[in-house]
Amino acid sequence: GLAEPPNVMRYQAPDINPNGKPGKYDWHMDVGPGPVPSMRKISYSILLNPTEYEGGELCFHIGRNTDPHGDQHMESMLGSMLLFPSYMVHRVLPMTKGTRYAIVGWAHGSSFS
């Protein structure tokens, strides 16, 4: 089920970000320790404004951790929903122009063994 409410994520380019840094999200997994993150099975991301920014691509790490070319960039259209296993390592690349909005959330199930 959907035990957590979805989140609206905002990433901004450095010229409009109050801290002057590009919005990004470093490599991570959505599943983790604790009662709520351990229940995450499927992660989703819905892109809300793909023509209004540059940079900010959602990337997935494929292959060994030492592989410098092991990430795959995902291109999305307005309103497209991307589903992936919550244990998959992913990131959002730094923004270069504009603001990126996405709705993200997780479907839950029994803990992984």
Regions found by a protein language model. Give the residues of each.
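Catalytic core of non-heme Fe(II) oxygenases with the double-stranded beta-helix
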Residues: G1-S113
